[in-house]
Amino acid sequence: HKASSAARPILDGFFLFSTTHRMLKIALPNKGRLADDTRELFGDAGLPVLSRGDRALSASLGGEFEALFVRAQDIPEFVADGVADVGVTGWDLVCESKRPVERRLDLGFGECRLIAAAREDSIVRSIDDIPAGARVATSFPNVAREFFQARNQNVEIVPISGAAEIAPLLGIAEVIVTFSITEWRLR
């Protein structure tokens, strides 16, 4: 009679891993508004998350869960690759990553919308005013490309990281596309 291999520990190098029980790994944003909202949600559920002031990379949550504190934009990749079992991040970041993850639950926070902006002295006053061939700067090139393709608008996507709003002011692009929780204009 052969024992089930699923119940035996597996020896891998110098580390012993048990296949009978392990903590659920949850990837959580390590900073920003999304991290603050997530910490509050988990605290309300009886799973207090450490303050990020301690610079921890991970923490146990109630003995059954392990929190992994990572950049919000890396969470889709960590979940898709199996580094984390589940994650909390923005849907905009999931869409941009193009990673095969499943959306399970809308937590009711972190809502934002895709916006386009141009300089105040620009002829562009709406999405429809963006001329063919216009340069559009964004830190969300995949989402922006899909958006303009769906509208049959031929634009040149200029991928940038960080503060996209500087691009029109520097002449890098005529328009920016980003996600925002508020209305704003370039000056």
Role assignments for model-derived ranges:
Residues 18-187:
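Domain-level signature for soluble enzymes in the chorismate/prephenate branch of the shikimate pathway
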